[in-house]
Design a protein with these regions (language model features):
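Bacterial Sec-dependent N-terminal signal peptides
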Residues: 5-6, 11-36, 107-121
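Solvent-exposed, low-complexity, repeat-rich "mucin-like" stalks and linkers
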Residues: 28-59
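Surface-exposed binding patches on compact interaction domains or structured appendages
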Residues: 52-79
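Short, surface-exposed loop/turn segments at beta-strand-coil junctions that are enriched for proline
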Residues: 85-90
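A short beta-strand micro-motif common to beta-rich folds, especially ectodomain repeats
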Residues: 91-103
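Active-site mouth of glycoside hydrolases
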Residues: 124, 130-370, 474-475, 492
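Extracellular glycoside hydrolase catalytic/binding regions
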Residues: 163-165, 282-300, 304-465, 478-495
Length: 498
């Protein structure tokens, strides 16, 4: 009996030993379930099966591919998901993902098709739209009004729950009415630009009481959704313009611009900081585009207003730097402008509807026009601009401000401005030009009219749509409505009279 029990014990132990899992041998190289993957244009997730002697890590990856480890590294094996974003470009793209495991490395190629190019549009071209716009005007200091200073958020602090009218009237203008635009249309204007500042109406602005004032820590600004009440008001004002039969330009305004010497400003779109803002920027334009996707061709979208570099340089990139020019930062700023323009166009086009062929406006760096001859870099904002898509439904915008009381001394400079726009934009890029803002300073109606008549005639002769910044009807006059500068109004319209 004892002998039988001993034999049984030996057999059980032998069986148990036989059931032990054999530890696999460490591989000598990294092996994958594929070296090249083709993914869908709409985006796709690939399960990359990796076998390696040690835990593999992704060390390099294009920004349109997101990587995520699935589960643990066990038995020298691991799964890594490669998720590609949708490719809204018309061109195919290829990216390389690099894996590292100890001293070993391996690359994976991901290929993604672009969108199919649409059939040639039968809609109005940008050149036709600009030609029809003629003379225009800016509804300034209304929907673009904002606190503007992160250390003094006075509008938000003044109201428990601000409503659109609190912003619209904050800078001294009345609530906008349809009658105002009817007055402009009946006079002969055919285009209105509606500047809109969006940051106060995206997500939540959380205020903190510091140094006896209300501050905004922008790092707490995480949400992207636009307040539907604000969007409804913007839509209402756009409808006013379109209902009067005029062209309407809708933009992203004081989300760009000068942030001041101590960088207290609220501008969050900076030319050489594209990566920091691209997700919010795309989300903003996606919401605007979806809201207006069924609107007709008389509505144009403008990418951004006056976007500056991290030095807040006007005239050309890095002019405000200590040495008055920094080639590295300037290159990043111009590349950033082109990246923002590209993202803007692709985001709008991807929403479909009439946005597939809507005329879009791309602004130069700072909306700089290249006027002047005192520095060789003045034309850089024009020469460094690249188009995000083929010409046809694109226009380029610049801004131009002068001193009307020095008009006689500036005629040659004004002439050179229009010559540069023709040379560096119209002929080089093959797109029309819009002067989205122009003016002659704070002068009398009589002085402004003389300058404005000349400037408007130059724009008319060049086939450029020019929209004056405010002035023509401001403050209490807008509520009537009536003209604040009737002589200037007449001078602007004279070249367009039959």
């Amino acid at each position: 009996m004892k002998r039988s029990l001993a034999l049984l014990t030996v057999l059980v132990m032998a069986a148990a030993c036989g059931e032990e899992k054999q530890q696999p041998l460490a591989p000598a190289a990294i092996t994958l379930n594929g070296d090249v993957f083709d993914v869908a244009q709409a985006g796709e997730t690939i399960a990359l099966e990796v076998t390696a002697p040690s835990r593999p890590y992704v060390t390099d990856c294009p920004d349109w591919i997101r990587t995520e480890a699935v589960g643990a590294f066990a038995d020298y094996q691991m799964t890594i998901n490669l998720t590609s974003q949708a490719n809204y470009a018309f061109e195919n793209r290829t990216g390389t993902v690099t894996l590292q495991a100890g001293a070993l490395s391996r690359t994976v190629t991901v290929r993604q098709a672009g969108r199919e190019k649409p059939e040639p549009s039968v809609g109005e071209s940008a050149a036709e739209a600009v030609r029809k716009m003629g003379a225009g005007w800016n509804l300034g200091n209304s929907l673009d009004a904002n606190s503007g200073d992160r250390t003094h958020m006075w509008i938000e602090a003044s109201y428990a729950t601000p409503v659109p009218a609190n912003y619209e009237t904050a800078w001294g203008q009345p609530v906008t009415t349809r009658a105002l635009f009817r007055m402009f249309k009946e006079a002969g204007f055919n285009a209105i630009r509606i500047p809109v500042t969006w940051y106060p109406h995206m997500g939540t602005i959380k205020l903190q009481w510091e140094n006896e004032d209300w501050h905004w820590d922008m790092s707490t600004w995480t949400e992207y959704d636009v307040d539907p009440v604000w969007m409804a008001r913007v839509k209402e004002v756009v409808d006013y313009v379109l209902d009067e039969g005029m062209y309407c330009i809708l933009n992203v305004h004081h989300d760009t611009g000068d942030r001041g010497e101590e960088k207290k400003g609220t501008a969050w779109l900076v030319a050489d900081q594209f990566d920091a803002a691209k997700d919010r920027y795309a989300a903003l334009w996606q919401q605007i585009a979806e809201t207006f996707k069924d609107y007709g061709e008389r509505l144009l979208f403008e990418s951004y207003n006056e976007m500056l570099d991290s030095y807040d340089s006007w005239c050309f990139a890095t002019f405000a730097s200590p040495d008055r020019y920094d080639a590295t930062v300037a290159a990043a700023a111009y590349a950033g402008i082109n990246n923002y323009a590209d993202l803007f166009a692709k985001t709008v086009r991807a929403t479909g509807g009439n946005n597939a062929t809507r005329n879009l406006i791309i602004n130069t760096y700072g909306a700089c026009s290249g006027d002047g001859a005192w520095n060789s870099h003045l034309t850089d904002p024009l020469t460094q601009l690249a188009l995000p898509e083929e010409p046809g439904h694109l226009a380029v915008e610049v801004h131009s401000y002068w001193e009307a009381d020095k008009f006689d001394a500036q005629k040659a400079d004004i002439d050179r401005l229009f010559s540069n726009l023709d040379r560096y934009i119209v002929r080089r890029l093959g797109v029309p030009v819009i002067i989205g803002e122009w003016g002659g300073g704070n002068v009398s109606d009589e002085v402004a009219a003389r300058f404005a008549g000349y400037f408007s005639q130059k724009a008319h002769d060049a086939g450029i749509a020019a929209l004056m910044w405010m002035g023509l009807s401001d403050g209490k006059d807008r509520a009537v409505p009536k003209w604040t500068m009737p002589l200037t109004k007449d001078a602007i319209l004279k070249p367009y009279l039959p």
